[in-house]
């Protein structure tokens, strides 16, 4: 279980949220919503331990995140707004960097992400959407329980969004957890996703 307890965050003398508390249990996924500048990416960075809140605490499996950082990161898949891939490497080589023991599974993961036939193309030669798919192919490889995804559908077409949404649904059905930001609808998942709305100083589930 991931828990945010009484989080407070201020940026540039402006309160993004205060008193923000919620939990994400096994089998749940949460969509963080809010306007530009509401603090969606900031919240995800707090939840992954990439930044510290100005007040409050994040807990993983009942322990403060700062005390269990190593075990938490072994349970985490974080894909930020920037795909975090190496443009000089091929799609296959990028996945091998993150999943060196899964060589036989890499082509299938890339195919699931819509990159069949692009496995050995340097990422620098791929479109923005294809580069995003290289990062998202990790969803078919990772063994992490918690997925935190910042705008995963950017530059992804409708069919790709549907395929990724099905993968997230399968992950939560198996007891995984997903937290994501997106402005796009989640096809077939509207009734199962909890929405956390950041409203400028507060939030509501």
UniProtKB/Swiss-Prot annotation:
It comes from Salmonella typhimurium (strain LT2 / SGSC1412 / ATCC 700720). Pfam families: ABC_tran. The complex is composed of two ATP-binding proteins (CcmA) and two transmembrane proteins (CcmB). It catalyses: heme b(in) + ATP + H2O = heme b(out) + ADP + phosphate + H(+). Residues 2-205 form the ABC transporter domain. The gene is ccmA1. Signal peptide: none annotated. This is Cytochrome c biogenesis ATP-binding export protein CcmA 1. Part of the ABC transporter complex CcmAB involved in the biogenesis of c-type cytochromes; once thought to export heme, this seems not to be the case, but its exact role is uncertain. Responsible for energy coupling to the transport system.
């Amino acid at each position: 279980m991931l828990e945010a307890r009484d989080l407070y965050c201020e940026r540039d003398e402006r309160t993004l949220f205060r008193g923000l508390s919620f939990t994400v249990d096994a089998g749940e996924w949460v969509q963080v919503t809010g306007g530009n500048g509401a603090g969606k990416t900031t919240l995800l960075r707090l939840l992954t331990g990439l930044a510290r809140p100005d007040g409050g605490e994040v807990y993983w499996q009942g322990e403060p995140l700062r005390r269990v950082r190593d075990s938490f990161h072994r349970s985490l898949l974080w894909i930020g707004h920037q795909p975090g891939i190496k443009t000089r490497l091929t799609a296959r080589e990028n996945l091998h960097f993150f999943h060196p023991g899964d060589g036989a599974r890499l082509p299938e993961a890339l195919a699931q992400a819509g990159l069949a036939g692009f496995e050995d193309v340097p990422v620098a030669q791929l479109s923005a959407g294809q580069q995003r798919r290289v990062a998202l192919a990790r969803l078919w490889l990772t063994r992490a329980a918690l997925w935190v995804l910042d705008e995963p559908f950017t530059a992804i077409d409708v069919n790709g969004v549907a395929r990724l949404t099905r993968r997230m649904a399968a992950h939560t059905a198996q007891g995984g957890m997903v937290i994501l930001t997106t402005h796009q609808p989640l096809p077939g998942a509207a009734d199962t996703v909890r929405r956390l709305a950041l409203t400028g100083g507060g939030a509501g589930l």
